Amino acid sequence: MTPAEQPTVPHRNVQPPTAQASFGAGVVVTDEAGRVLLGLHPSGTWELPGGKVDPGESIEEAAARELIEETTLVADPADVEVVALLLDSLTSAALTRMTAVTVVRTFTGTPSVAEPDKIERWEWTPLDRLPQPLFRPSAQALKAWNPELPLEDGPFHHYPFAARARPAGTGD
């Protein structure tokens, strides 16, 4: 076969793809009493700690990093459990948000405000007295972690993982 007879292979685009999704970790932090840690955003909504997963970072590393950056609590990535993946398009019809729901039960420190422009205060909250309004992605993460919670969480796709952390007081 001569070079002219060889089939041509189209050149692949070597440019990075246009982002079609954002990926983050939501962190459900529980204390010995089974309460969850929530922060009051300046807009008046309550939210879990969390944020984006940086390039090259594992979900567990991102959750531990976001936890210390936002709350000053220190958790070992080995103590972070990934319990579910959520997909929604709440922030943009053109961009899918993917959130890894993580649970942290072992940590050191006392929560304090590390980013006052993002959180006014942190509070340990009993599950039967969750404050309102909850930031919708935080409500989704809490509902994925504990489906019994009576939360309005909006439309999203929920992919639970087989081995998942159980909410406090739910047995084995």
Labelled PLM ranges:
Residues A25, G51, R65, A78, ...:
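Structural detector for helix-capping/boundary residues
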